[in-house]
Amino acid sequence: MYFTSSISVRINVNMHSYLDNPACSIFAHRGGSIESYENTIESFNYAVDLGCEYIETDVQLSSDGVPYIFHDDDLHRFIGKKLRFNDLNSNELNEIKLFDRFSIPTLKECMETFPNTKFNIDLKTNEVMKPAMKYLHSINAHSRVCIASFSDQRLDFVKKNYPNFCRSMGPSEILSLKLHSLGLKKFLPEADCVQIPIYKYGIKLATKKLIETAHRLNLKVHVWTINDAATMDKLINLGVDGIITDKPNLLKERIATKK
């Protein structure tokens, strides 16, 4: 017996064009951060040259309001100093070299350099949410960008203000989908896809039952972040629609063995 919700929601009847890829797709995590230099133009070129269907990346905001491609809240991992990213202006950020070689790309530079590439973009902060979405909307990027976040608030903002953009599920929706797959809650999704780890808080999410449930709801399932061949093989056999990985070349090889 299902529990019911009083909230009226729509089922995802028509799949978003962003998701129009057959079989298991390769999401190069930060461009393939083990095989290349994460979140740089170099790593994105690497992923494109491999033929990856998608690039997963992140956006942070400079102190003067410019969206940049960057994951961490600070620069310690790259320059050994705990300078908060959003405390630095664009002039200061442009002087920094990642891996002693590469500039931190802006979102604009990324989208202009790779006009035919599909991106899965994680909005890292509330501050970057509005300027990033305003820019992506201004270049009509809804067919090649999916918005992701660990924040329900940010995803709700995208749903309300930019409904044409593909959106992955937030934490609350993922929990509802899991309960629905177990027959504990009725759930009709509003998002376009679900992107999950195998486990979260000790609960297994990437199960055959959840994947089948998502597919019945016309949702594609992407699993992160998978870097070993055995797990890739298991997920491909389970029927996931995409795998987010730091090793896109390895995943490409594993997918090839299934054809």
Which stretches of residues belong to each language-model region?
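Phosphate-group recognition and catalysis centered on beta-loop-alpha active-site segments
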Residues: 1-259
